A protein has these predicted regions:
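Signature for HUH/AEP ssDNA processing cores
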Residues: 1-132, 136-164
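Structured partner-binding subdomains within large eukaryotic complex subunits
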Residues: 165-169
Length: 169
């Protein structure tokens, strides 16, 4: 549905070439799971182009959200990163978090990795797109998340530096 008084939860970036119109939308909590199932069915599983972004909640704190968008030349036909790269990414974040927080030996929290089933070749834009999302189950304010991102950015770029990226970190 269109935005209500709570403001948009999602925005859609328009792309005239693809016939995708921009907009802002409000998905209520009680419809979110249904929305995600429909989105997966109609967009992700059919590998359709879509430019929908979820607005990050700007409360005092929220789980740590990491979004890695990887762009390559169109001739890249297979996923470039491996499970080892993902493990290194998680290790880099955990090392930085241990510098920012005091954890006891028994501290445990979830780390979720989300990735598409396959890369997305976009001939119209002469590129191949890939990427992943990571959610770390620690509550952290938005400003602190920005600090964390700045602290890990160069380390991730160094670790994944052999990738033939066409975009920057």
């Amino acid at each position: 549905s269109k935005c209500d008084a709570a403001g948009p939860t999602h925005t859609r970036i328009g792309d005239d070439k693809s016939g995708i119109h921009g907009g802002a939308y409000y998905i209520p909590d009680d419809k979110y799971n249904e929305f995600m199932e429909l989105y997966h069915r109609d967009v992700i599983s059919k590998n359709k182009l879509e430019y929908l972004t979820e607005k990050q909640i700007m409360t005092d704190s929220s789980p740590i959200a990491v979004d890695l968008d990887l762009h390559f030349a169109l001739d890249i036909e297979n996923r470039v990163y491996s499970q080892e790269h993902i493990d290194d990414l998680v290790d880099i974040y955990l090392a930085e978090l241990s510098e920012m927080f005091q954890f006891s030996e028994s501290t445990a929290f979830p780390v979720f990795i989300f990735e598409k089933e396959k890369i997305n070749r976009v001939p119209d834009k002469n590129m191949t797109k890939d990427g992943l999302h990571m959610i770390i189950g620690i509550q952290m304010g938005h400003d602190a998340q920005c600090i964390l991102r700045n602290r890990v950015k160069d380390k991730v770029a160094e670790c994944w530096g052999d990738f033939p990226l066409t975009n920057s970190w």
